[in-house]
């Protein structure tokens, strides 16, 4: 049995869960999220009101999907109650970020500013010219936008310049030594 998959997902007060076959819809104070669970996996509610994810047999694919499905359902519940935030920072001379309306405008050493538009359900906040955060209720969207922004100027292994997650340790390389 999957150790993660067999744990029930607790549903806090103020969260409404609707299960219709393979579709799970979670509505909470921050919004609504939907998920379609893969075919052999079943989702139901137990007597305590918690969400239980079960699998029909112990085939390898079903074992893999069991833990995954439980985690995805848990992420829905966390998203509509607390939301997700990724904090990022910029290192480098002249590298900065500013908020233009609901979009982020980056100066990353290119000949032009780079503008990232906020997709639906994602909000940007700028704490300083070198620190900003990405928030939303969908964990996948927040992570994907964060990765896309980091890819604009990956941290350089020699000088450490670029966009990185807050607290991320960059493996530094030693430069060439002169004679």
From Swiss-Prot:
One of its GO terms (molecular function) is rRNA binding. Disulfide bonds: none annotated. The keyword rRNA-binding applies. One of its GO terms (biological process) is cytoplasmic translation. InterPro entries: Ribosomal_uL6-like, Ribosomal_uL6-like_a/b-dom_sf, Ribosomal_uL6_a/b-dom, Ribosomal_uL6_bac-type, Ribosomal_uL6_CS. The keyword Ribonucleoprotein applies. Pfam families: Ribosomal_L6. GO terms for cellular component: cytosolic large ribosomal subunit. This protein binds to the 23S rRNA, and is important in its secondary structure. It is located near the subunit interface in the base of the L7/L12 stalk, and near the tRNA binding site of the peptidyltransferase center. Belongs to the universal ribosomal protein uL6 family. NCBIfam families: L6_bact. Part of the 50S ribosomal subunit. This is Large ribosomal subunit protein uL6.
